[in-house]
Amino acid sequence: MAKEIFKKQKPHINIGTIGHVDHGKTTLTAAITYVLAKNNQAKLKTYKEIDCAPEEIARGITIKTSHIEYETAVRHYAHIDCPGHADYIKNMITGAAQMDGAILVVSAVDGPMPQTKEHLLLAKQIGISNIIVFLNKIDLIDDNEILELVELETRELLDKYNFSSDTPIITGSALKALDNNLTSNIWVDKIYELLTALDSYIPLPKRDLDKPFLLAIEDIFSITGRGTVVTGKIERGSIKLGDTVTMLGFNISKNVVVIGLEMFQKTLEIGEAGDNVGILLRGIQKTEVKRGMILSKPLTMTLHSIFQADVYILTVAEGGREKPIFEGYCPQFYLYTINITGSIKFSSETKETGTKMILPGDRVKLNVTLIYSIAMEKGMRFAIREGGRTIGAGIITDIIK
């Protein structure tokens, strides 16, 4: 039986839930599908269906990023449910890098917590400028003053990371919205209020449709008898069946052919910038592909391992390290969906200033040498991490080798 064709009838937006572990991100995602399924605007997805991987169920936390589809009266959404546990921040980076906007879920019982802050920081670093807050579990709060304090604390946190002062904060209870036994469910209205805020507050992103095709690979699957499927968000350009694309990364460059294109298990005639797609490829084995590699229009991207960058090192107050950084320092660099070790040297400009070390809060020009050659270009942004935390952010200003 032929698969349903994905028809683009509304503007497409990538949205996602971020926030601390156990604050209700996955429950909220399930509640959104529950409410919209009544109007045939989503397929109902339970908490267990969203948290479907064995290791997720075993630990009771989200490890991978789950993609859910739904629509409102005016938009089509791809919703990414992001991990909240500190051990899996790198997967959160993969998911968040695909978002046009985010829903920050904060428990009214706990208030903002460590991962709340880190997720906001990461969102800012990877270019998410529009956030909506869902203050969850308010059914467990009897004192309005406590609720006001949590909202104030959340506003202060948004201000600290330079998010707008008019950021909507919706109060509600995702779990209560899922309760079938309530005769009058005011909590469902709160989900609609959240969706209305999404439609009105998150602007339609400008897609780079005219630039050469580029997709950063997030995941890889093998379909017996058919070939290898890669998934990810199209960063720019477009792609269709029969196109030849180049796979690049980890010292590998190879041309492959697109023989299948899907979005949410539906056949896609053409994939465009902003779409989260699955691409069936001919001419490559699953073992040859790694997360972090990219697909691009042939001859538009090349492999490099040494670049110059403008870098900002976070202060302790921003969640950064306390100690200074010296030449030879080897942290992890996160570019698109790849995380890779690299060593730093001071650029000639930095050396001319007499700099011997970099202190938290400094902005410097650095030369970075990665352990593998990867696809990169001027203007690419990256995060720098060590020991489970983000310690810096930068932008590539020149390719050296």
Swiss-Prot record:
Residues 10-206 form the tr-type G domain. Its EC number is 3.6.5.3. GTP binds at residues 19-26, 81-85, 136-139. It is an enzyme of class 3 (hydrolase). Residues 60-64 are annotated as: G2. It is found in: Plastid, Apicoplast. One of its GO terms (cellular component) is apicoplast. Residues 19-26 are annotated as: G1. Its main location: plastid. Mg(2+) binds at residue 26. Residues 136-139 are annotated as: G4. This is Elongation factor Tu, apicoplast. It comes from Toxoplasma gondii.
